[in-house]
Amino acid sequence: MLSRLFLAQGRFCSSHPWEVIVCTLTLTICMLSMNYFTGLPRICGWNYECAPQVKESSLSSDVLVMCIMRTLAVAYLYLQFTKLRTTGSKYILGIAGLFTIFSSFLFSSAVIHLFGLELTGLNEALPFFLLLIDLTKASALTKFALSSTTQNEVVDNIARGMAILGPTITLDTVVTTLVISIGTMSSIRKMEVFCCFGILSLIANYFVFMTFFPACLSLVLELSNSNKYGRPVWHLGRFAEVLEEEEDRKPNPVVQRVKMIMRTGLVLVHAHSYWLASNDTELMSRDMLYDGNLLTDKKIDPTMPLWEFYATRLWPPTLDYILTAILATVLASHYIFFSDLATYPEKRVSIMEGHEVVNPGSDHEDASEVETIGTLSSSPSTSDVRVIESMTSRTQACQTDPVTASPRNSRSSSPVSSHSVKPARFTIGSSGSGSEDEEEEVIKEEEVEWVLETELKAPRPMPELLEILNVGKGPNALTDDEVQLLVGAKHIPAYKLENILDNPERGVAVRRQIISKLLPITDALEKLPYASYDYSFVSGACCENVIGYMPVPVGVAGPLLLDGQEFQVPMATTEGCLVASTNRGCRALRSAGGIHSVLIGDGMTRGPLVRLPSAQEAGAIKQWLEVPENFAAIKERFESTSRFAKLKSIQTALAGRYMFLRFKALTGDAMGMNMISKGTEQALHALQTMFPNIEIMSLSGNYCTDKKVAAINWIEGRGKSVVCEATVPAHIVQQVLKTSASALVDLNIHKNLVGSAMAGSIGGFNAHAANIVTAIYIATGQDAAQNIASSNCMTLMETRGPKGGDLYLSCTMPSIELGTVGGGTVLPPQSACLQMMDVKGSNIHGSGLNASQLARIVCATVMAGELSLMSALAAGHLVKSHMKHNRSALNIASPLPSIDEVATHRRSKSVDFSALKESSAAAPGTCTANAS
């Protein structure tokens, strides 16, 4: 019951950090302001002169003892932060810890004000207050938070941590409060003051830990996470390990029961002391804190503001306070600047801006193994990048690529060793004025929080490695070299590295190291990036034996006006001018009033192959399936495998005693190959139950037909069947497309129809539909191989209008195979491209609407590309545009002016060829300007 309450409370605080922080600070300010403006009626030393005996008692405090107490309090606080440092980034945890201490002190002061007590005795009670602060539980809760990989997991893990830690902390707080409260009955005034402040600070600390700290921790981690994809920079490890560690530290049930008994006994003691013996024992009152003798006090006029009076009392400029401040400054500086090397000598190398830091205790040999990768230009434009100073193959969770630099970097190009590594990164954006060598060796600042965590030493023996892997601390305690040894000895399958290491990025890095040693050129993978990618979406879904990811440029064509709605269409391609040409077609069709589309068919297919003893039996089964009642029975079995699968038809064909069945079904917003395969398998089992002689030879008999040129897809359709049409007025054809409707119609007939027929084409009656289909497929995470059938397209053109100057064109695409859920659509970049067109995931208004809309967009974009390319061919601009804008080298010399251009200058005495040359030239790769 308590765990559930703390779970809900932790989830609320961590999911609403701003609200909790603002409410806590507002409550603190309100409590402080209650008595700050009104003031206490009697404040010793400010508006009243205390009795002589009180002053004497105050002045007789042992300064040496208090100085020792303050020193111990500062040292204890430093040790608490050092413990907290072991869980992760010292800056994140330091900020959270400082927030906690500051807020606890501030809130304690507010509580003291709320109870009507003054703060003049808090300066001596401050060390006691600091000694009561225990950051162990804060460290435990922080470990729960740092084991998260996303911000949503941060909220969940903080809530789980609160559910585990909350009951224990509550019990400890109650018992400690009751124990300290015994001191309030000691009749020793100084002890009563200390215990009073201690009780109030415990209550304040408990409130802050339960509310302010979870909210602050959640907010700090959210603000510090600069990686949109991939693991956050503060990611610590597996949640299960943190949970297991906390379970190991769980208090003994016997101790918990003893605490409960102590709590009950202490409550009875206090009840007896305060309630039953009230006549013999004085209650704790204000007189304990400012003055108990009302008759001997003398009222005086304040000589300073109340806040200044409290400040001088809390921190007077005396020698013991100055020594305490110096000690606190030294320890804080040591914690911030030297704690890495002093506390963890195994972290020999730190990542800094252009400097190399080596542990002084390391010998020359170890230091010589540290590589320094150059720095980028120091210009302000490169301030957002940091340089990885050193990388070795001994990193635990952040291993780099085992590829050596090229000879131009003054490093050996010999085969890879375990101590020569170089990170591979894919960086987008300008790199300032640095040289090319420097540009290749820099990465963004948020990508480098990497330090070495192990000594540079030889791998341990194989038996010890197996014990660590199977029984000990697990793969996290192994270096990359040791993991490679286990892979080479077949103890770890290479394809399971991500799962066994429980760190996908490290698994990919280790696999790259293994593969690099097998390549003829060891640094072949240097330019293939792998870091800062969320492989959790890849494993078991999109790719196996991953060694990186392939960045492909993504352009946008649009706005595409389709059925009254505008779309920006993403296209991933390396073919120059493709996006620009498609963009020009979109502009022309938008000016013409847009494109209209119609979905004429929908259904993914799977065509299994079965064999029967004779053709006669095969024919009988074919006729049996044509009976509606029998088809309904198979349909019911088929649809039992998925709530989205809806079987539409079963088409059969015989080849002797072999029977091919083509199951066609709706698959919702998924492309549906896996879905329909499961349904087909169950349908075949049902058919086999009724006809035992059926022998299922293959779930796919190429009668589908998938990823192969086939007339059946062109005729019967597969996936989505879409037709798009538009009418382009004559003035747009002439002004935008630079041609005429009659020329386009004539070219389309002889090129797309006659030419394709002469080539024996099946579904290829178009100019370049596959270009657009493939570019959109790669951008949106579709199966790129399915462009074979999806690119089936017939482009038709006709003249329209009174004078035949308008152009009517249509594109018919009967087999667009795509989906908006599953497969590569789950990858974050591809998902973003789907989101651009508002077709990401399943449609909440109807199953399959998003996939159908995407198919319409594909067909409409194909039509825009067809119109632009055909216009370029008709006008004779194709070769010229590609020679200018689709070459990797510098542009060839610009051609001489055309006859038409010369004619416009006939009235001039001379022709300015240089001006014409400048107007026709363009920078490399800027075909968008001319095509838009």
UniProtKB/Swiss-Prot annotation:
Transmembrane residue ranges:
20-40, 59-79, 92-112, 113-133, 162-182, 193-213, 322-342
Looking up CDD domains in the UniProt record yields:
HMG-CoA_reductase_classI
Main EC class the enzyme belongs to? oxidoreductase
Q: Which family does it belong to?
A: Belongs to the HMG-CoA reductase family.
* Compartments (UniProt record): Endoplasmic reticulum membrane
Signal peptide bounds? none
**What gene is behind this protein?**
HMGCR
Region Catalytic, annotated ranges: 468-932
Main localization, broad class: endoplasmic reticulum
Active-site residues per Swiss-Prot or TrEMBL entry = 575 (charge relay system), 707 (charge relay system), 783 (charge relay system), 882 (proton donor)
Chain segments carrying region Linker: 343-467
**Glycosylation annotated at which residues?**
279, 850, 886
What name has this protein been given in UniProt?
Answer: 3-hydroxy-3-methylglutaryl-coenzyme A reductase
Q: Where is the composition biased (Low complexity)?
A: 406-421
Keyword annotations for this protein, in alphabetical order, are: Cholesterol biosynthesis, Cholesterol metabolism, Endoplasmic reticulum, Glycoprotein, Lipid biosynthesis, Lipid metabolism, Membrane, NADP, Oxidoreductase, Phosphoprotein, Steroid biosynthesis, Steroid metabolism, Sterol biosynthesis, Sterol metabolism, Transmembrane, Transmembrane helix
| Pathway given in the UniProt record | Metabolic intermediate biosynthesis; (R)-mevalonate biosynthesis; (R)-mevalonate from acetyl-CoA: step 3/3
Q: What NCBIfam families does the database record attribute to this sequence?
A: 2A060605, HMG_CoA_R_NADP
Per UniProt, the ranges with Polar residues bias are: 374-403
Q: Which GO terms describe its cellular component?
A: endoplasmic reticulum membrane; peroxisomal membrane
Bias class Basic and acidic residues marks the residues at 357-367
The organism is Strongylocentrotus purpuratus
A molecular-function term among this protein's GO annotations: NADP binding
Please, which domain of life does this record's source organism belong to?
Eukaryota
An example GO biological process term is: isoprenoid biosynthetic process
Reaction catalysed by this chain?
(R)-mevalonate + 2 NADP(+) + CoA = (3S)-3-hydroxy-3-methylglutaryl-CoA + 2 NADPH + 2 H(+)
PROSITE patterns (alphabetical): HMG_COA_REDUCTASE_1, HMG_COA_REDUCTASE_2, HMG_COA_REDUCTASE_3, HMG_COA_REDUCTASE_4, SSD
Describe the function of this protein.
Answer: This transmembrane glycoprotein is involved in the control of cholesterol biosynthesis. It is the rate-limiting enzyme of sterol biosynthesis.
Q: Name one Pfam family in it.
A: Sterol-sensing
